[in-house]
Amino acid sequence: MRIGLIDVDGRHGKKKWGATVYPNVALGKIARWHTMQGDNVEWAQPTDLFDRHHYDIIYASKVFNFSHGIDFRQFSYDRLEKGGTGYDIHKRLPYEIDRLQPLYELFPWVPKNHAYGKLTEGCPNKCFWCVVPKKEGFIRPYMDIEEIAIEGRTHVVLMDNNILAAGDYAKEQLQKIIDLGLRIDFNQAMDARLVTPEYAELLGKV
């Protein structure tokens, strides 16, 4: 099958002025799964969308609801899958895809030693402006650091919403990070109110 991917937020081809552009992890996981099935995966070009036979399936991901969307009504694809917080906060990847890591070849600007992922999902807080509790629920374990740091990638960008709220699981993962000698970017920051002496000691070694 021929698979077309669309990053509605328009980030897959942009990197200028030294800005950090993060890969769309969900589309990366979808790409890896289809590649494992022997399918051909590529970024969909706008002109190709008018040919309904060009792709067997199109996946469109929209992270932000303020991103300018695409009017898919002008296209007549039988298999169009739309996902991401910008479309539906409750739609999730199938389990067998969600457990995979992104196909990093899809994002040529990502350094060969970088990996992206989350150790936890959810958050115990209910900030009125945040979609996370509605989308992911209460804080819980999600992945092990060794699942994320694949292919010799030693610089891991963790996009957890509130990792320190995960208690013993967070401490276990921090110790693993230390033991593995990984460099970590806690990309979504941390809740300073949760930093205990034990956490401080672990974080000081990361």
Task: List where the protein language model places each region.
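Conserved SAM/AdoMet-binding glycine-rich loop
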Residues: 149-206
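Structural preference for beta-strand elements that scaffold enzyme active sites
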Residues: 57, 79, 114-116, 155-157, ...
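A cross-family glycoside hydrolase active-site/sugar-binding cleft signature
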Residues: 6, 44, 61, 83-85, ...
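A short, structured N-terminal alpha-helical element that caps or precedes a catalytic domain
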Residues: 1-79, 88
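Ser/Thr/Gly-rich flexible loops in soluble cytosolic domains mediating phosphotransfer, phosphorylation
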Residues: 79-107
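Flexible, charged surface loops at secondary-structure boundaries
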Residues: 49-56, 74-77, 110-111, 148-153, ...
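Ankyrin repeat (ANK) tandem alpha-helical domains that serve as protein-protein interaction scaffolds
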Residues: 95-96, 107, 114, 124, ...
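N-terminal pre-triad scaffold of radical SAM enzymes
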Residues: 4-23, 105-136, 153-160, 164
